[in-house]
Each structure stands twice: as C-alpha cells, then as structure tokens.
Amino acid sequence: VPTIAPFDGLLYDAARVGDLAAATAPPYDVILPHDLARFHRASPHNIARVDLGVGEGPHEKYTQAGEILRRWRDEGALVGVGKPAIYPYEMRFAYRAKEHRVRGMIVEVGLEPWGRQIVPHERTMAGPVEDRLAHLRATAANLSAIYAVCAGPSEAQTSLLDRVESRPPDRELTDEEGVRHRLWVETDAGGTDTEALAAWYRDQALLIADGHHRYQTALAHREEMRSARGPGPWDGVMMLLVDSASENPPVLPIHRVVAVDPVPEIPGDRVRDLGEVLAWLADDDLRFAAVVRRNGELVHLVGRLEGEPPTVSALHRNLLDPMPGVRDLGFVQDPALAEEMVHTGRFDLAFFLPPARVEYVRAVVEQGGQLPQKSTYFWPKPRTGMVIRPLS
C-alpha cells in the first residue's frame, strides 16, 4: 500500500543564488557529458555539481558531492522550509504546436518492494544502481523527485492543485527547453490535505515513469540503513505523483538505430522524407517508419505492425529481435539525429516510433510484462533542485 507524507524540504534561497533556472538542472541521467560543463558554468550553485559530482577519482566525486551539499546548507544557499509540507508542482510547455500543462505533487512515498503497488515498466541495471547508491550514501539526500503516475482521478489532489494556483508559486523558472516549472509549498497546518490524499493513495498503483534506478537505489539504501540504525527517513523517497487520467503527460518515443549486415528488406510504403515520416507517426496504433541507406541514398518507409500495442513491443517482436546480423543497436530521441546517423554510415537503418500512451504502458505491466529497454521518455521531467529531501 503506497503511503505518502509531507516532508521538510530544502529550497534554494533565490536571494543568495540568483537565477533558479541557472541553479537547477535536468535529472542526472539525461545530462550528456558535453553538456555538464554548461551547467557548471551557469552557476556556482548549480545542482549538477552535487548530482554528478566534480571529483576526478572513482570515489572523489561522491565525497565532493556530499561536501558541496553540506557547504551550501551551512552558507544558507539552501534553506529548510521549517515544517513538513506538500509541494504542488506544475510544468507548462508546448507540444505538437499546442500549449499543455502537467500537474502533480511532490511528497515522501514509503518504500515498498517492486510489485503491484510500485510498478516498474523497465529493467534496472547494476552499474547505475551502484553509482547512485554511493552517491546517496555521501549526500544523504533525495535531490530529484522520482516521477510516478497513477490511474486517477483523485478529487483530493485536483482540489489541492486548483487551490494553490490561486496564489503565486513559491519557486518558478523556465528551463533551457522552454518548459515553465512552478512549485508551491503547502504546509497544510490542519492535516486535512495529507489525510485525504493518503486515504486515496492507499488503493492506487504507482507506475514509475522516470527514476527506476533511483527507486532501486533507495531500496538498497534502506536495507543498509535499517541494518545499521533501524527505521528512519531512509524508509521513504521523494516522488512527483501525477494523475495520468486528468493530466495526460506526454510519453515521447525513443527511436532505434541499427548496424546490421546484411541490411534486411523492411516492409512498408516509400515516402519522400523525414517530414512525411513524422506526419505518419501521429498515433500509437502500430504505425512505424524506417530509413535505410541503399546505394548511398536514404530510403524512407512507413508501415504498420501486427500484434498488440504499444508499437515499441511489436517492433522488437516482429522485426528487431528476429533480425540476423545485428552488430550494434542504439537509442536516439531526436529523429533528425537518427536519420543523420544512417546518412553518415555510422548505422545502416533507423526505426522510428510514435509517441506512446500511458494506458498502453500500464496495460503491459499489469499483465506482468515489461517494455523493451529504452522504450519511453516521459517529458517534461521534474527539475532537479526545485526541492530537496534531506535524510539527515
């Protein structure tokens, strides 16, 4: 049973750190190596200095991360709310030429083993968990909220979100992708919000949209700390909870690039260019597309797959998994970059996928299945550093 609770979070003091957009960052696992220096330059208080570390040695970056976080707290760059709070959160953005918003709330969620109540849709790998566990030991803090969706709708959550929007947010910024992030601090002196939300979430399954490795890390850290010190704040983790029925968060596709010999014949109808490919991929009704390099020319194809959605599962089942001679398989979010990788000869073909639907993802996991690796990209993602949950 998912249990939720308010927590006394840490917030940047805007008077000390200045521009909050320059002090915050995307989640650690979407910051490319060549972009890290840009975030470091943006502000001496950029959260990436803690989230990814600045040391050179195998352990130095973790030690430095903990020291930097403690120094910022001592200096007053990060200040505590002073009492437990719920943190309503909103992201406004343009998607498919329309304005959208996704709302949720950041809370502490009690840790439970993976199962029917806390549901993964992708597998975790040992390396990232080991990295994040060493980082969590050093920092003793949840720096970014794990993103989870529930089937909803929740009247208690919607009522809370509607109410706080009547006042200015406590923190607000626009990030490098043009997404507007707004956060409120709701201390809920009477406890009624917490009680109503907790009662509703007792019967909900939380689908992890982003943060599988962070959740697995929190489970491992809890076992360590319980063995050493018993129950404590390590029994929970910070999450952004979004009602997918009301908010309909976009799930962007992650395209596949393939190095293969021989290059197979791909079924489909030929179209002119990438623009027509993207127009074809308007819905997740088993539509797919491909670009193949033949005799130095790019050939663009569109078609439909057989089977059950989501399309990414059908693509792997029908075309990718049985394909002989695959030397390399890559994952690319930008379709133009995937096309360029084929054009330059780095890969021989690319498969393009439509945006997924949350209900398709949920249907797979509710039947006990999991999606292929790198199947979904829930976007936008909550900003790291908007609120921090300390464990000490």
What do the predicted segments below correspond to?
Residues 1-392:
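Surface-exposed, charge/polar-rich loops and edge strands
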